[in-house]
């Protein structure tokens, strides 16, 4: 009796291996592969300060109008809060609040705000008269109310509305955020970014650059945020949140 047995050719049967053998019928564990080297991520050197200049070294950043409005709301808020801290002796004055709002006021602590052509009212809700009137109503109501005489109490309406918060937080959105988003950033993609607005008069920034910077100016007046500029409004609320967490906070000049 003659017996025959078949012998399968052994080798690497994995087509992904370096030594794949198309003739092999049985894998013998000899497959070899290239070592997988993970890609090396690019490295970036993030400066601690950014300075934006044109080709001639002229500074292209300007947002003084926004800084003025932040200062105005800061002084208005401080005035509103005096009704909470004076033991009932400081009755707010409606004409003071209203004149602070439209900047006909002359009693600013920072006298540079007097008659500087900037105001909060005209920039509220992109000029919506109804929204402006609502803020003026709150100012008048706050002035008509009797200041609290007990420590720890706050000036508020019978329904629980705290006028200082309504006015301060309301203008942070209706003025500052409205201007950022609805005025400056909404159409920035179509702004010119090739030529200076008016270099002869010191406006070395392009239209796009200026609109971006003015939007930033409503966030904070600080050029080294968050090293400074964390004491008020949106700069205060954003501090220690995402920007600081991801380490992207740098100075702007």
Indicate residue ranges for each PLM-predicted region.
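Mature extracytoplasmic or organellar-lumen-exposed domains after removal of signal/transit peptides
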Residues: 36-253
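Bacterial Sec-dependent N-terminal signal peptides
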Residues: 2-56
């Amino acid at each position: 009796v003659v017996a025959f047995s078949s012998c399968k050719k052994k080798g690497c049967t994995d087509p992904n291996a370096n030594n794949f053998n198309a003739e092999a019928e049985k894998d013998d564990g000899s497959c070899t592969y290239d070592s997988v080297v993970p890609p090396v991520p690019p490295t970036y050197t993030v400066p601690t300060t950014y300075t934006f200049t044109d080709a001639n070294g002229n500074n292209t950043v300007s947002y003084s109008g926004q800084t003025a409005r932040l200062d105005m709301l800061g002084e208005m808020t401080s005035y509103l809060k005096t009704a909470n801290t004076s033991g009932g002796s400081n009755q707010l004055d409606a004409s003071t609040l209203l004149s602070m709002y439209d900047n006909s006021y002359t009693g600013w602590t920072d006298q540079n705000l007097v008659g500087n052509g900037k105001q909060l009212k005209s920039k509220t809700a992109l000029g919506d008269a109804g929204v402006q009137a609502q803020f003026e109503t709150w100012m008048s109501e706050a002035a008509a109310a009797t200041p609290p005489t007990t420590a720890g109490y706050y000036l508020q309406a019978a329904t629980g509305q705290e006028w200082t918060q309504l006015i301060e937080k309301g203008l942070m959105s209706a003025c500052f955020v409205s201007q950022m988003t609805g005025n400056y950033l909404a159409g920035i993609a179509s702004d010119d970014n090739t030529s200076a607005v008016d270099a002869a008069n010191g406006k070395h920034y392009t239209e796009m650059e200026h609109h971006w910077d003015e939007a930033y100016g409503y966030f904070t007046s600080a050029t080294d945020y968050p090293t400074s500029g964390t004491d008020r409004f949106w700069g205060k609320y954003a501090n220690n949140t995402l920007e600081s967490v991801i380490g992207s906070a740098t100075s702007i000049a």
